[in-house]
Amino acid sequence: MGESLNGLKRTMMCGEPREEHVGKKITLMGWVQRNRKLGALEFVDLRDKTGIMQVVFGEEINAEAFEKAKGVRSEYCVAVTGEVVKRESVNENMPTGFVELKCENIKILSESETPPIYIKEDLDAAENIRLKYRYLDLRRSDMHKIFEIRSKTTKAIRDYLEENNFLDVETPILSKSSPEGARDYLVPSRNYPGMFYALPQSPQIFKQLLMVSGFDRYYQIAKCFRDEDLRANRQPEFTQVDMELSFVEQEDIMAVNEGLIAHVFKKVAGVDVQLPIKRMTFKDAMEKYGSDKPDLRFGMEITNITEDVKDLDFVVFKSAIEAGGSVRALCLKCGADLGRKPLDKLGEFVKTYKAKGLAWIQIKEDGVKSSIAKFLTDDVTNSIVKTMNAETGDAILIVADKNSVVFQSLGALRLELAKQFDLIKDKNEFNFTWITEFPLFEYSEEEERYKACHHPFTAPMDEDLDFIESDPGNVRSKAYDLVLNGEELGGGSIRIHDTALQERMFRALGLTDEVVNERFGYLLQAFKFGPPPHGGLAFGLDRMIMFLAGTENIKDVIAFPKNQNAYCYLSEAPNIVDEKQLTELGIAILPKEEKNDKE
């Protein structure tokens, strides 16, 4: 049975004692990292979130404490009181390594079974074990540091936004389902049988209603939920730094958020973000980097060589050009020494992105070698080399297809080459860029209609208003994403505040008046009462913490995350509920083929 504190107070944390505390009597509380016997002495490494302190027990120091210490085991929770003394054998690898505590009294506050994972920094336990015993995983000091960073970050965000006249307003968690976008998490209503709430994918409509309400500047650190197939670094529930502003244009919102980013990264990481953050249009990003979230920590831009090869009698190039596509390439410095096998592997790699293959040209000391040598002339080869700014020792990697395939495959290849050839020299660099002028619509082959690239409330560029009905595929939007090191950190847009324009948008999306009224009627009703021009943005807080904490795993920055199948090993959620609960809700579970997707 564990002992009680009985008024005993902790006077220092385990990671705090230093040489200047020698001779001072202190009380520490924490968990036993390990204990060991050395001659007539018993040593215990005591750990809390701040670090580890060595505690020494001996017959001559205190016989009762010495006897009790013999029984402690790993992860026992204890309180120790004694005098800080200099260590005979210094451990320079520990901040407390110059001192130790001569223990005069120990209280065993609670005992521990043998833990399923050993609490250490270089933990090698399987992820499912870490998630099942997350409370033990979180005892590690490097995990504590991550959540200290998270706490500092949210404080810095709140401080900045409130200094800039933003108001923190909570929006509903139980809301209305909208089939546009990802699947909703649905919550059945007991009071309204057969009807459901939805957990919010974002506070989008409610924050726009707050602008109609005259709140002017709103923010919220909001929980959001999406029932989607989880890719790497996605969670079914996540946190957004959400905001909306009235009487603003795109540049106003970008300026506010540049200030926010600069403030947070300086306060939390000591990083000076260079302002203003550079801008790049969606079109330029796709043509140069094959991605709407380009990693700009290295070069290797995609180059259009269509003009150089348009007269070649090579069916792959010719058919791509005739179909309205293009021929584009990357220049891999020092790639001329690559053998046929690695080049073939790169060819297989681009095929996974729907490219038909990869042509290549290597510029060697003794001439040019190419997979399409029999189709090339000296003039065309020289023209390609000049356009690519290639030099002796380089390799030119070429894809020909419709533009969407060319961009996607070469964009992915660019990132793959960066990994293989270690092209990102400064892994600690924070390289920000704004991506602007996204398409307003994207065509869904599956549904045979245009869909909103972002959401149906995004405003089109003024100069493209006339093309919403006649040429929707080429209409640009007043949408913007903030990209950091090839990851989308946040995104937003100027919203449509004109009812007539909003109705045109819904019609272009193929939504009937009945559907629009059912899904968004309450927003459109509000827009009859003088909505201001407004816009906003949302940052992914979890992703921001990943960058600030230097981790690549989103589960590290969420206290109790789910696995890739949205399963919680700790609480074993989701779970089967009582039949009585289902009956109250008017729900019957249909039989389904059983499968285990927990892993």
From Swiss-Prot:
Quickly give the catalysed reaction.
tRNA(Asp) + L-aspartate + ATP = L-aspartyl-tRNA(Asp) + AMP + diphosphate
Give GO terms for biological process: aspartyl-tRNA aminoacylation
Q: Name one GO cellular component term.
A: cytoplasm
Top-down, what is the taxonomic lineage of the species of origin? Bacteria, Bacillati, Bacillota, Clostridia, Eubacteriales
The listed locations are: Cytoplasm
Q: Which residues does L-aspartate bind? A: E180, R226, H454, R495
For this entry, the protein name equals Aspartate--tRNA ligase
Q: Which family, according to the similarity comment?
A: Belongs to the class-II aminoacyl-tRNA synthetase family. Type 1 subfamily.
Keyword Nucleotidyltransferase in the entry? The reply is no
Q: What is its EC number?
A: 6.1.1.12
| Function summary | Catalyzes the attachment of L-aspartate to tRNA(Asp) in a two-step reaction: L-aspartate is first activated by ATP to form Asp-AMP and then transferred to the acceptor end of tRNA(Asp).
* Complex formation: Homodimer.
Start and end residues of each stretch annotated as Aspartate: 204-207
- Matching CDD domains: AspRS_core (cd00777), EcAspRS_like_N (cd04317)
Q: Which GO MF term does the entry hold, naming one?
A: ATP binding
Q: Which Gene3D superfamilies match?
A: Bira Bifunctional Protein, Domain 2 (3.30.930.10), GAD-like domain (3.30.1360.30), Nucleic acid-binding proteins (2.40.50.140)
Pfam families associated with the record: GAD, tRNA-synt_2, tRNA_anti-codon
Keywords carried by this UniProt record: Aminoacyl-tRNA synthetase, ATP-binding, Cytoplasm, Ligase, Nucleotide-binding, Protein biosynthesis
Q: State where ATP binds.
A: R226, D227, E228, Q235, E488, G540, L541, D542, R543
